[in-house]
Amino acid sequence: MNDNISPIHSPYKAPNTISLVAGKGDTNNPLNAFDMALLDAGICNVNLIKISSIMPPKAEVVPLPDIPMGSLVPTAYGYKTSDIKGETVSAAVSVAIPKDKELCGLIMEYSAIGGKKETEDTVREMAKTGFEMRGWEIDKIISLASECTVENIGCAFAAVALWYK
C-alpha cells in the first residue's frame, strides 16, 4: 500500500478536459451499428468506460483530442438502436457548466425514438433541472445530438468524453 495516499483522496487524477461527440450508424446488426456510430463520432478504437454524470471542476471543453488506441476513456453516453425500417432514433448529451468554477458541472445523456431536436431539448432541460436541485447557478449549457433514420439496423450515439490535457 502506498502510505503517501490519504484514504480520503483518490489515487487517480481527475480528467481536465471534456469533448462532446455524436454519430450514427446503420448496418446489418446492432453491435456493428453501434460501432459505426462510434466511428462516425470519431471516438472509435478506444474502450469507453461508462461514467455517471459529473464534469470535474475547472475541466475545459475542447475538440476531441487524439486519444491513443486502446485507451480507457471515461465517457457519459447515450444511444438508441432500432431495427424498424423508417423509424428515427436519436441520442443527445448536455453539459451544464456552473458559474462558480470550484463546483463540478453536470453531464446528462438521453436517447429516444424520434428526432434529435426533441431529444436535445429534453437533455438540456435535464441539465437545468440537475442544477436547480442543487441550488447552483448555470453559466451555460452546451449540447450535441445525433439521429438515424433506420434502413437496416440503426444506431444514434452521443457522448461526453473526459480526457487529459
Swiss-Prot record:
Cofactor note text: Binds 1 pyruvoyl group covalently per subunit.
Matching SUPFAM superfamilies: Pyruvoyl-dependent histidine and arginine decarboxylases (SSF56271)
Lyase is among the record's keywords: yes
Top-level enzyme category: lyase
InterPro entries per record: Pyr-dep_his/arg-deCO2ase, Pyr-dep_his/arg-deCO2ase_sand, Pyruvoyl-dep_arg_deCO2ase
Keyword Lyase: yes
Enzyme nomenclature, EC number: 4.1.1.19
Residue list for modification Pyruvic acid (Ser): 53
UniProt superkingdom: Archaea
Gene3D superfamilies assigned: 3.30.60.30, Pyruvoyl-Dependent Histidine Decarboxylase, subunit B (3.50.20.10)
Protein name: Pyruvoyl-dependent arginine decarboxylase
Primary gene name: pdaD
